[in-house]
Amino acid sequence: MIPTFYQTHLKKQLTSAQFLVMTTLLSVMQSEKQVRLERLARVFPYPITTESRRRKLQIFLDLPNLTISLIWFPLITYWLTTYCRIGTRLSIAIDRSQWGCINLFMVSLICPRRAIPLYWSLLPKLENSNFESQTTNLDQVLPLFSEYKVIVLGDREFCSVDLGNWLKEKGVSFCLRLKKNLCIETEHLVWQRLDELGIVPGTSLYLQGKKVRKTLPTTGFEVACKWKRNYGKYQVKEAWFILTDLGSLRAALNAYKQRMGIEEMFRDCKTGGYDFEGTSLKGNRLVNMILLMTLAYSSAIFQGNELKKKQVQEYVSRRTEQKKNIADGLHLVLD
């Protein structure tokens, strides 16, 4: 089931035949939880041969108007204006996923315990993203959030001080996890690696007004340091070192914790859900297939939130039964 505002927008961008294929394909994707073209062609409800259905879907994926800017961005804008007040603080996570010969850069909007893809692109080489690719992808989505307070979250691949400076110039807050071998100036002309600051499990530290990066040092940043406490068998291997401008340790840690939503999103879209790593599509067809998957995935999230607001989720989801004691069951049988 596709939300009404999705259908209204898609009808404006597609012909009647294209809209019918789109909505049918989204319904199939939601029911099958698959984006593999062969699987979709096999179950697509159209009275032609499987090979003809596969070819029909390939032609659909090649449509020139099937783009992120035309199909997806207006839906994001509608959702923001409808459900988010102007000035609301929103978190955007950046990440990269690689499988086979595919290197995918993803920008996502953090939702409660999940994330929704905003923009994605295929990197030309199988390597970490660089400053240019990071800023190019962020430039695509930041204009959508001009009326909101944005925090960009990134793991250690995105620990570039240059990226922090670029975000600061854009008026965007950030929490970028640093590598432990980065140096900061603790005293005048005294530089220390982050892992030499004496942070141990159960301790934290917040550094302000320190120079960061021994080569081409930069000022104006803050570094939040936190090593979670060990509990029994639960051992935390290393500390968090986060480059930020949020002003306090608590704010930085609470913001960065939200980045885990993009990990859950990738799990839902990979082996735990739509299995987009299993598709053999490449290039523009893969980008457009991820667009369709995003429409199916996000519509399910939006509808789930609406059901929660109506407090009817207990009637449409599987009830979790409590584990019964075997002895109690045996007692009932004997009686």
Protein language model annotation of sequence segments:
Residues 54-114:
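Active-site-proximal, Lys/Arg-enriched surface segment
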Residues 1-34, 46, 53, 71-73, ...:
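Single, function-defining residue in the core of a domain
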Residues 37-47:
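DNA-recognition alpha helix
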